[in-house]
Amino acid sequence: MKAKDIIELTTAEMLEKEHQYKEELFNLRFQQATGQLENTARLKQVRQNIARIKTVLRQQELNK
């Protein structure tokens, strides 16, 4: 998900997306621990998406 797409979301939608990504990250880490994870790059992508969402939320918080 690109930052441009995240900016267009409402705060509630951003928080929901963040929650979804955190759940996905948990599941990916579990798969990695059990040796079932095939696409290891997905871990990095999910972490970066969480960081992007948190960054946009913080920017909005500071602008208010």
Swiss-Prot record:
GO cellular component: cytosolic large ribosomal subunit
Sorted UniProt keywords: Ribonucleoprotein, Ribosomal protein
GO molecular function term, any single one: structural constituent of ribosome
Family annotation (InterPro entries): Ribosomal_protein_uL29 (IPR050063), Ribosomal_uL29 (IPR001854), Ribosomal_uL29_CS (IPR018254), Ribosomal_uL29_sf (IPR036049)
UniProt GO BP: translation
Top-level taxon: Bacteria
Assigned protein family: Belongs to the universal ribosomal protein uL29 family.
Record protein name field: Large ribosomal subunit protein uL29
